[in-house]
Amino acid sequence: MWNQIYNPLGSAALSTLAAAIPVVTLLVLIASGKVKAHLAAIIALILANLVAIFVFTMPANMSIRASLLGVVTGVFPIGWIVLNVIFLYRITVETGRFELLQRAIGGVTTDRRLQLLLIAFAFGAFFEGASGFGTPVAITAAILIGLGFSPLAASGLSLIANTAPVAYGALGTPIQGLASVTGLDPYTLGAMVGRQLPFFSLLVPFWLIWAFAGFRGMMQIWPAILVTGVAFAIPQFVISNYINPWIVDIGASLISMGCLILFLKVWQPKELWLSPKLRGNDESAATMKPPKPMDTTKLTQPQLWGALLPWIIVCIVMLIWGTGMFKSWANAIFVWNYPVPELDKMIMKVPPVAARPTPEAAVFSFTYLSFTGTGMLLAALVSGVLMGISPAKMIVEYGRTIRLCAISLITISAMLAIGTLTRLSGVDATLGLAFAATGVLYPFFGTLLGWLGVALTGSDTASNVLFGNLQKITSEQLGLSPILMSAANSSGGVMGKMIDAQSIVVASTATNWYGHEGTILRYVFLHSIALACLVGVLVMLQAYVYPFTAMVLK
């Protein structure tokens, strides 16, 4: 048995600096653009092992086993999702159905800004709600690149858009995780998050279009942006506060998409924005072929249904795969839980990170049938059959997809290994305790702790499990609402999603722009920090300033 140590150097400052070495190295190497993402991840993983073993005194066999657990987790379920999303996209291109989808979207609007609202924000939120875990970025980035957007625009804007829905992703999994470690009521936590994120559900669509087209380009379509944001934010609040936190994203996204499409039947911008490039310096534009003019010829009914068929199948399958009933049924048929020897329940999380000494689980759960990626593969295979692709051709295309994604899968696995190792070694808890020592400013920095957690782990759920109890304990010691600060961990965390290395690799893979992760990170980094700080300001107001304090649930 090994107890985690959070101040191994006897100095909080020095221990925090040591704990930051792996993640800072990873971000700096990727942002430099001079080191490929998979090499940066491997270097950072080696450093994480050295820090865990020689600074935090984690036994070497535990450190290596934790890394291997992370590697496998990177393939299943995360890499498995990416692989099958790309496979689906490739067979729709191969059969010409994606070109029909382009025409269908062009029939709604040829304006690139409005396409972003429809695809990146509203459609992406649906997939976040149904499955989460990288699915929305993979799908929306692939669709945007297919529509002719530049690689940087498709990847970067998909990441920015996938923020406001994240706290309720995968049918409320982050809220469930937060409730499990804090002991607080999940409905109350979900409702409190629903009193924070709607402000940003209204803001993010404006932010998204400003990032793409500049202030003037944004103001030209402000009515459509307002409709999209309001139609998402109000249902997000109502569903989370008066129904449940499990269906928030699905309900809000469908209402937002429907309202935008209906609004565009009676309103269109006076000046169309047809450029697929980011306004200003878009270095990815040089790699693009000149975009073909979008064919806006009205589709026949059979063509329209043919274009939408694969995506309708995906929506249905993802909804089914996300339900607890299906997961219970599928896992009853097949599940393999592998407790890692000499690691599972052999590490103790201790106060102040946990209320009492708590053994850390280290189990690889191979729930193959209920994996989101398996549902995506089934959707792709069914779509392929209905689109007339032979089994032999699908096998060949799947082999090509594996070759295309191989390096990305290695990268994702190495990054998950870093996240797993830092969690089990207590390295990330040391970083969290540094934020917890900020006193009266804790509502702001506690929110940034959630942001850091997602940036480190790549998951709002993992961040909530990692820091949720720390938020509860610290807030009680400071006389703050534990409901407020636990919810702030999740709300602040959503803004870290766009800079976590795993999501960036998913975006670069989906846009076939692998090797440019540094460019993507540099593009989204300031957006991420700015939005996280705004969430922190809101939480500060809710902690101390009336009437915002009246929003806090007891």
Where are these regions (language model features)?
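Alpha-helical transmembrane segments of multi-pass membrane proteins
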Residues: 113-125, 151-164, 185-202, 211, ...
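Re-entrant/interfacial helical elements at transmembrane boundaries that shape
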Residues: 135-143, 159, 173-183, 210-212, ...
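Juxtamembrane and boundary regions of transmembrane helices in multi-pass small-molecule transporters
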Residues: 167-279, 491-554
